[in-house]
Every structure is written in C-alpha cells, then in structure tokens.
C-alpha cells in the first residue's frame, strides 16, 4: 500500500505558528484516520488532540474518517488550527463577614468562548464585542464558602475558555489588551528556568502574589502534568504573568457588591530550548535565568496587583487565578 507524506502548515488563529516552516509527517497511510494523524502531531509537538482542528481544502476533518475518504494524497497540505485553552480561572470571594447576595459575572472578548462553567450557569451574549457572558448569584460566608439559592456549596467559581477563529483587530486593541488567540510569551517578558528551579520559583511567586495555601496547591496540581511533560522533553520553562488591566479587557470580571480589592493572576508559560547546540537558532538560546535574578522580579508590581489590599482581612476581597500554555514559543 502506498504511503502518504502530509505537509502541515501550522496556524494559530490567522498567523503562521512557525514562520516559513511546515511539519513533515512520514509513515502516514491513506487508510490512516484523522485521529491517528492528530495523535502523531501530539507525540511530536505536545499539542493535545482536543486542541487541534485539521483543515483540508477549506473543510474541517473529522476524527474517524480516513485520509483516503477526504482525497488526501501524497504532499497534500493540511492546516492545523490550534485551540488555546485558558485553564481553570477560579474565582474566590474572601469576606470577614457573611454577604447574602453577591453577583459575579465574566464577559469574554471575541477571541475566546466558554468551554466549561461550574457551577452551571446560562451563557448570554452581551454585545457585538463579546462572545458570551455568564453570571453567578451566590452568598458568601466568613470562611469563603459560596452558596447558591439551592443551598449547594462551593469553594470557588470556575470557568474555562477556548480560543475562537480569528477576528479582525485594530492596532489599539492589539497592543492595549491581552488577546487569548495571540498570547505573547517572549524572551523579553518572561523568566526562563529549568524544571528543578522552576517549581520552587513558581510556588514562591504565587505566595508573593497572595494566593493562599489552598489556592497554591490547586494551581500547582492543575498545571503540574504540563510542567512534567515539558521536563520530559528535555526543555526549560518560560513563564510570565499577564498585566491585570490587559486581562480585564479580554475577560471582564464584574462583582456586586464591589470588593475593595480584586486580584487576577493569569500565567502564560511554554516550553523553550535554551541549549547551546549549533542547530538551536531560537531566541531562547542561552537564556536560562539565574535563580537569584528571577527571585528579584516583583511580579505583583508588574501586573498591577494590590498586595496591601489583599492582605486586609477586614475587607471584602476577590482573587482569581488561571493560566494558559503557549505552544508557539
């Protein structure tokens, strides 16, 4: 049976993921399913199957169908559109006394849409500039436990979102807000560390950003499989945090009554090759940061987080954390 070589051009939203480069997949047969091609891509690039959309001749390919059924032949070119995921933004409400009625809403910009919401809530479209909005109505007690009208109790409000097909943007929008479909993780805005230094550094950074022990534990356990996968590839980890004012324009958080302090900690991270090999021509070459230099960075100041306000246990406060792995670094 003839074997097929497929050249994939990688796209994130509307731009090439790697300029001028295509992944060449060998060992693919006409009888191979779309699912098996995605599995090969996942093994080669770490991109989860669930976040891949394969496009051929303007048509999205379905997992169970074979390449032959789509008339994909030798040297065919597929586009792989990546769905980036904003992982587990969790909203905590902290109050010294019970508040009977609290309304919490999140409204997303057009670049992404809700994939998971918990507690369950109805989505609504709020404006032409937004994909959707969700609102929760809860009470909060002095221990931070949230209660719905049904009496069910929760530790936090949870939402997760996936990026959508690209939409036109004007320059002002692009440079003044976080764009979930085009997250920016560069050598100039991030810290690069090997895994064995990174984990302790991240734990310390989260503590400085005023996440409680419970929040830090949830954060680390949620992202640890991704960090371990990067380590197992022999790569280092680049990390940055999104400025709060920019993130607010991509995911507007509204809380009534208004807390005295609202903190939104959203991490971007990705795998990078910092080795000094001749074939490594990336911007990350030799860019591992000394741990002492990394420890000197004041992330709270960089992202505009009010540390003093968060420490005031006499006040009503809100804390949200989340993150996103960036694959085109």
Outline where the language-model segments fall.
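Protease-labile, long low-complexity intrinsically disordered regions enriched in Pro/Ser/Thr
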Residues: 85-329
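Ubiquitin system architectures
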Residues: 1-87
């Amino acid at each position: 049976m003839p074997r097929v070589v497929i050249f994939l051009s990688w796209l994130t939203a509307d731009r090439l993921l790697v300029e001028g480069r295509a992944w060449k997949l060998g060992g693919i047969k006409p009888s191979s399913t779309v699912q098996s091609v995605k599995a090969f891509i996942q093994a080669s690039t770490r991109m989860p199957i669930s976040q891949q959309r394969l496009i051929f001749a303007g048509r999205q390919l379905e997992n169970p169908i074979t390449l032959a059924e789509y008339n994909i032949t030798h040297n065919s070119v597929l586009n792989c559109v990546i769905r980036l995921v904003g992982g587990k933004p969790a909203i905590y409400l902290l109050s010294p006394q019970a508040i009977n009625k609290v309304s919490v809403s999140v409204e997303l910009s057009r670049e992404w849409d809700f994939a998971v919401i918990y507690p369950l809530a109805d989505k609504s479209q709020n404006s032409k500039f937004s994909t959707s909005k969700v609102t929760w109505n809860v009470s909060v007690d002095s221990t931070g436990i949230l209660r719905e009208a049904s009496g069910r109790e929760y530790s936090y409000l949870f939402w997760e979102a996936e990026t959508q097909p690209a939409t036109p943007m004007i320059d002002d929008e692009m440079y003044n807000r976080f764009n979930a479909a085009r997250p920016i993780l560069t050598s100039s805005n991030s810290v690069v560390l090997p895994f064995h230094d990174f984990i302790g550094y991240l734990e310390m950074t989260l503590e400085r950003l005023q996440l409680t022990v419970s929040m830090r534990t949830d954060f680390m356990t949620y992202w640890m499989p991704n960090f371990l996968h990067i380590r197992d590839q022999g790569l280092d980890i680049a990390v940055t945090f999104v400025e709060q004012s920019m993130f607010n324009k991509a995911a507007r958080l509204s809380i009534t009554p208004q807390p005295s302090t609202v903190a939104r900690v959203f991490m971007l991270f990705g795998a990078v090759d910092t080795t000094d090999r001749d074939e490594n021509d990336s911007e990350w070459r030799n860019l591992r940061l000394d741990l002492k230099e990394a420890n000197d960075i004041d992330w709270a100041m960089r992202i505009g987080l009010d540390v003093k306000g968060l420490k005031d246990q006499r006040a009503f406060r809100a804390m949200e954390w989340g993150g996103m792995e960036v694959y085109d670094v």
